[in-house]
Amino acid sequence: YTVTGCTSAHLAAMPANTTGVGVTVTLTASSACPNPSPQYEFWTLAPGASSWTMAQAYSTTNTFGWSTTGKAPGGWQLAVWVRDASSAGAYSISLGTFDLSVSIPYSVTTCTAVSLSAMPASTAGVGTTVTVTAGATGCPNPSPQFQFWILAPGAGWTVVQAYSTSNTFSWSTTGKAAGSYYVAVWVRDASSGGTFSNGAGSWDLFGNIPYSLT
């Protein structure tokens, strides 16, 4: 007499393969098991991560709605563990037990390009108000967010307009020192927590241009 666990498992995602940040991806698992009502547990592995995260614990529910809002863009791995209803798990690892496991690659995308311009272009006299305009293309969702920065001569970067949906910044140069500046923008998709980060914040894309005050 042989006791067997599940013999096959499958995992599919909708939308398939890739989606923009902010979309809820529906994962659907199926399996061939000796008994009715097998159990499914869903897992995710973030881009660059080494540890899997349980997204939905074992239950008889074979679907999981994975919200990508705030998730890091890039290559993910999505997985399901399957156990027969009468099985404690044919395999055991530090994270738990399963009869079978299946994983699929999945790509989450965000904004693909950023532009930045100034008017007057390139140079202006001290006292001029410079209009800085940014643009973002390829963003999965409407209303990306923009954060503007200035690098003054001999100084560090300073946020001059915090993240908002406004893609323009009016830079008053009254009282500013003449010299070479840099103007920059960080861009994030409306549903992105930022692909990259440092001590100053997070962003999906950035761009900068030199600017001279005379």
Which residues are covered by each model-predicted region?
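Proline-enriched interdomain boundary motifs that mark the N-terminal boundary
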Residues: 5-13, 109-118
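Short, solvent-exposed loop/linker segments at the N-terminal edge
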Residues: 16-23, 122-128
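Short beta-strand segments within Ig-like beta-sandwich modules, predominantly Fibronectin type-III
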Residues: 54-60, 159-165
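Surface-exposed, short loops/turns at beta-strand junctions within beta-sandwich domains
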Residues: 68-75, 173-179
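Extracellular recognition modules
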Residues: 77-83, 182-188
